[in-house]
Amino acid sequence: KIKEKLIEA
Protein backbone atom coordinates (compact mmCIF):
# COMPACT_ATOMS: atom_id res chain seq x y z
CA LYS A 1 0.00 0.00 0.00
CA ILE A 2 1.24 3.48 -0.87
CA LYS A 3 -1.19 5.13 1.50
CA GLU A 4 1.38 4.99 4.29
CA LYS A 5 3.87 6.67 1.96
CA LEU A 6 1.75 9.66 0.98
CA ILE A 7 0.74 10.39 4.57
CA GLU A 8 4.41 11.09 5.27
CA ALA A 9 4.79 13.12 2.09
Curated annotation (Swiss-Prot):
Keywords, ordered alphabetically: Cytolysis, Secreted
Localization in the cell: Secreted
Gene Ontology cellular-component terms listed: extracellular region
Top-rank taxon: Eukaryota
Species, as recorded: Tityus obscurus (Amazonian scorpion)
Tissue distribution of the protein: Expressed by the venom gland.
UniProt GO BP: killing of cells of another organism
Predominant location category: secreted
Functional description taken from the UniProt entry: Presents moderate hemolytic activity at physiological concentrations (micromolar range), and weak lactate dehydrogenase (LDH) release from mast cells. Does not induce mast cell degranulation, and antimicrobial effects. In vivo, injection into mice causes moderate edema formation, but induces very weak or no change in nociceptive sensibility. It also causes an alteration in rearing (standing on hind limbs), but does not impact locomotion.
Keyword DNA-binding on entry: no
Protein name: Cryptide Pep-5
